[in-house]
Swiss-Prot record:
Protein name: Argininosuccinate lyase
Origin species: Salmonella paratyphi C (strain RKS4594)
One Gene Ontology cellular component: cytosol
SUPFAM superfamilies: L-aspartase-like
One GO term of the biological process aspect: arginine biosynthetic process via ornithine
Pathways involved: Amino-acid biosynthesis; L-arginine biosynthesis; L-arginine from L-ornithine and carbamoyl phosphate: step 3/3
Pfam families on file: ASL_C2 (PF14698), Lyase_1 (PF00206)
Domain of life: Bacteria
Main location: cytoplasm
Reaction it catalyzes: 2-(N(omega)-L-arginino)succinate = fumarate + L-arginine
Matching PROSITE patterns: FUMARATE_LYASES (PS00163)
Amino acid sequence: MALWGGRFTQAADQRFKQFNDSLRFDYRLAEQDIVGSVAWSKALVTVGVLTADEQRQLEEALNVLLEEVRANPQQILQSDAEDIHSWVEGKLIDKVGQLGKKLHTGRSRNDQVATDLKLWCKETVRELLTANRQLQSALVETAQANQDAVMPGYTHLQRAQPVTFAHWCLAYVEMLARDESRLQDTLKRLDVSPLGCGALAGTAYEIDREQLAGWLGFTSATRNSLDSVSDRDHVLELLSDAAIGMVHLSRFAEDLIFFNSGEAGFVELSDRVTSGSSLMPQKKNPDALELIRGKCGRVQGALTGMMMTLKGLPLAYNKDMQEDKEGLFDALDTWLDCLHMAALVLDGIQVKRPRCQDAAQQGYANATELADYLVAKGVPFREAHHIVGEAVVEAIRQGKPLEALPLADLQKFSRVIGDDVYPILSLQSCLDKRAAKGGVSPQQVAQAINDAKARLAL
């Protein structure tokens, strides 16, 4: 049933109908559309459009429809209705007859869909926040179990300074905490109701929109009807949140793909999140992580696409805005799936401590310690930096780590170097000295774990 047929003398071309209809994707808003309709029926009682008995009949029928939708949402797709609003209204009329035709009084699909989408976004943000915190918790637990797993830290994908696997985990906890904060911030701006703004100029009925907003669980009602029906900032914000969050997950995946490789060998992934090759029997491929990394691109694309869709639209509503849903649904579904999968990857990961330790001892990751040692002996840092660079060249020539160079060889580069240099060059000393807040010392890592556990109520 079309909601707009009276103006037209010809039926829509079937090809246009297929092009125009949105039920195939906006059916996901069915529950929100029904909930919004119940609230609207209550508002219509306050302005005398519906009697209390009529409202009761409508609410009962809508609640029955809500249970039917929850039991089998796929039934909606069997309809040829234009959109979810048409489908709900048609089903309501089937249940209560002519009374169902009174429900849309004073309401437009413009404020209706804006409300539906905001309600859906609020619910989805809460799901994302839960999944985000679950992954943070998994990272904290993995960190706690691997505080003594020393490994090389990297810059430019070259070994730089020793860190611990726990410190690496906590780096991603920080990223995810920022993602959590962004979602919570987005939720604040989502929490205003556009219902009652009509097509663009507001409703002609003296409905208390603040009361209506409260019935729907919003903090308040929007302030301008033109903006309310054309606002899709919340879609852009959520897509931006998702794009940033997926960048973090993609980096997480890339790190672990490298750590899991034969070239690094720092971790082994569980069989539960890997697959094999149809040709090469020995292969164990990190498919879960590669898919997380790969799916990042589709989320970035959804954000870019929506920004391009909105950038040239005049006020107020335009049909272009129908394009807001498919990209949003897919992007947030993808982000949610990837958060869950990242937690599953951590659930079975094994850290290979001996291999991590060996790698941390290679690559002259303690060179900065020698420079700091020279500074403590009164050598200016820039000069110390140069001295250590020369010492590294000599160590490479001899095929030895810095700590294996004889004292006489080290003193060729600076006479201030003494026997006390060797304890300074140990991996444990490298870690212990990074004791400022946020550093990799065991004490700081333990404190960071405790802080994260307190924040996450673990």
